Amino acid sequence: MKFLKKIFLSIAFIAVASIGATSANACGKVHLGDFDWDSANVHTAIVGYILEKGYGCQVEVTKGRTSPIMAAHYDQQLDIITEVWRDNIVQMHEEAVAAGKIIELGINTPSSTQGFYVDKPTADKYGLKSVDDMKKPEIAKLFADPEAPGKGRMTSCISGWTCYTINLVKHKVYGLDEYYTNFDPGSGGALDAAIAGAFKKGKPVFSYYWTPTGLMGKVDLVQLEEPAYDNECWTKMMAVVEKIKADGPDAYTDTCASAYVNMALTKSASTTFANKKSNKKIVDFIRAYSVPTPDVNRSLAFYMDESGGDMEATAKHFLSNTGMLSLIHI
């Protein structure tokens, strides 16, 4: 079976080596690590489909939260990660690279954002433009936390995601912890549901969120200003974040904080997998795999609105729209 050398994806392209394999035995087993948020799931589904149908691989997927999945990746238990939020785990990721546990395979999604958001109607009505504007009792009451009387609620990351601890530290540095809880919604789906449900009911929203996502194209959220991203400050803050992750919230020490950086999302492979000659074509494919943020957003919107929650159908839809589906089945 032949596979095209280069296929254009909007303004980016995926280079795919020719495939001589027609059976799982020719490729062998590939163990992908996946996370509990939709954009990672889309990439895992697309890559998994190509590996199975195009390269003849036997694909296994293990899905979970950031810390355990990345730990398993560093421990050579998971071969490939297709969406790494590198700056959120920068210390342990760089240590893993330096120790020769993984190799980085370049950029997947060129641009992503994350931060604190308020729904536009509330932001406009009360003049909420920055995190400092949130530090008023009358504003906190708009976002009342039913489980913490006297405080507002900011719906945050899930506790197994590093951004939950980053947000915890930011709350303390910015003084938001006096007015708001850093609420763990329990899952990425519950976070989406909390935001979408509030919009449907016309209720105020104060939440952490990010792009690329399908939901962001459906709701009108305003990102609050924070101190501008500063690499030196971020490094200091992340040292505190890692201490808290290891030893608990009481390990917090005074630090600075800044906005999340506009981040390029990356890919990586375990060195055990990457160093096998038989895996070279797979590693070359993953290295070349890159999807622009708008295409990711469109795929996520399809997943949410048209696929019936079927991630494989979403992958096939994406591949069909880019001309790749027919090539895979040549």
What are these regions (language model features)?
Residues Q91-L105, G202, M216-D254:
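Ligand-binding "clamshell"
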Residues H329-I330:
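Conserved small/polar residues in nucleotide/adenosyl-binding loops
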Residues T44, T62-G100, A194-A198, G214-V219:
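Pocket-flanking alpha-helical
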Residues A71-A72, D79-T82, T155-M237:
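Ligand-binding pocket segment of bilobal, Venus flytrap-like solute-binding proteins
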Residues D38-C57, V169:
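Short, polar/charged alpha-helical segment
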Residues K101-S156:
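A conserved helix-loop-strand patch within extracytoplasmic ligand-binding domains
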Residues C27-S39, C57-T62, K151-T155, I286:
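Short, well-ordered beta-strand elements
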Residues Q114-D124, N262-S278, A301-F302:
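A bilobed periplasmic-binding-protein/Venus flytrap-type ligand-binding module shared by bacterial periplasmic
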